Amino acid sequence: AVLRWFSMACFSVLPIAVFFKNRAVRNVAITFCVAVTIAQIACFAQYLDCFTSAAGKGLNSLPVSEGFRAFLINPAFRAVWFAIIIVLQLTIPIILAINENHLFKYNDKIEWRNYFIALPLVILASIPVYVPQYLFGQTDVILSAYSWLHFLWIFLLFGTLAALYFGFRKQSSEVKMVVLFVLALSLLMQYNQMFGAISLNIKRLPLQLCNLGAYLITLSLITKNKKIFNFTVIINVVGVLFAIAKPDLEGKGFFYYYNMHFIFEHSNVLIVPILALLFGIFPRLDKFALRDCLIGFTIYFLSVFALGTMFNAIASATGKGIYEANFLFMFLPDVAIKMIPFTKALFDINFKIGYATFYPILQLIVYAIFILVCVLLYYCFRLIYLIKDKIVLKRAALAQSENIQSGNNLIENDGASGENNEEQSSEVEGEK
């Protein structure tokens, strides 16, 4: 489990080392990542046992033919796939060392300091969702809504955001981008692990807002597309706020892998876009940001409304639960009512067309609530900007006033000095 964890850290480090000439990241790539890759080769037999086991979930839960499933866990295919990954993990550090002439400066204390800052942060950020359960078990401490663990997570979430901001705010833009990419790639990896750790079905598709955010956040950082970012930062913060207020938990032990998925995903979906704003990677949210968000959410809502209705109709027609969808929690009454009991009355207002079921009042309310909260959040951002600008102006005015006062004092001192000199000159002349 620890080796798989470290290999996930390589997944974050190596792409960043290619596109950023950051010495700390490249030092991790040519040392830590090479060591991990060699260890993976040495443990190939154990890897192959895991890859080809029919006892796991993930690939074995796919609704595909037995022949195709057998191909996916075929030892020869998995060995080739493993070899491709290993070659890539070794090729990148070799190219960095030879073509880029990158070598670790072992005599440089700053090099070591930055290395031991970067390495633990990368390892901690990239922890797979299943590793805590593997190492410690689920534990007897239950993570449930409004429990002390729930509030501890909220505290750590905002504490981590503050620590990252104050820890890196004075660093260069390159370092800030490296931090954001480490978090974004870790988020992407941790979400995709759900397909292997749990199952791959319609519910697991990245069409819930926070699941989609795992991809859009990375895309916005790569493309620097302001419209994608505007949509992502507002709508995903709204999504996380809803998740914090009404967490979708299963009442299992704290380290249960779905709990880890829930915590890791919603933490990074909030932290990465907010940090990007605070670091100045993207400009302030202007009047067009709300427009981009509302247009983007409307397109998203209509898309998941159509897809959710279609998939649930297929599930009803075939009797196969794998096709059930519950995007925005507005399709499956049992799940939504368990989380929010008063929605039962809204689900009771429905009609059918063939196998498709529609809940018009509930679905319109969901749309309206998201739009309202997005608007409120946007104006909260604007209010924060206004308060910050007033503080900056006040400090600037105070500094200017102090400079003027210092200048006046200097002039007065010069004047007094001049008068003293004149008096001394007069006294000397009188004595003569």
Predicted regions and their residues:
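A conserved mid-domain beta-alpha-beta active-site/ligand-binding segment of alpha/beta enzyme cores
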Residues: I274-A315, F347
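Membrane-interface helix caps and helix-loop-helix hairpins in membrane proteins
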Residues: F195-R204, T223-K226, D248-M260
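Alpha-helical transmembrane segments and their cytosolic membrane-interface
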Residues: D108-N192
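Membrane-interfacial, low-structure loops and terminal tails that flank and connect transmembrane helices
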Residues: N99-N114, V392-E412
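Hydrophobic cores of alpha-helical transmembrane segments in multi-pass inner/ER membrane proteins
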Residues: F6-P15, R78-A97, L152-L164, N211-L221, ...
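Membrane-interface transmembrane-helix boundary segments in multi-pass integral membrane proteins
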Residues: E66-V87, D140-I154, L290-L294, I314-L377
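Aromatic-anchored segments of alpha-helical transmembrane domains
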Residues: A35-A45, V122-Y130, L185-M194, N236-D248, ...
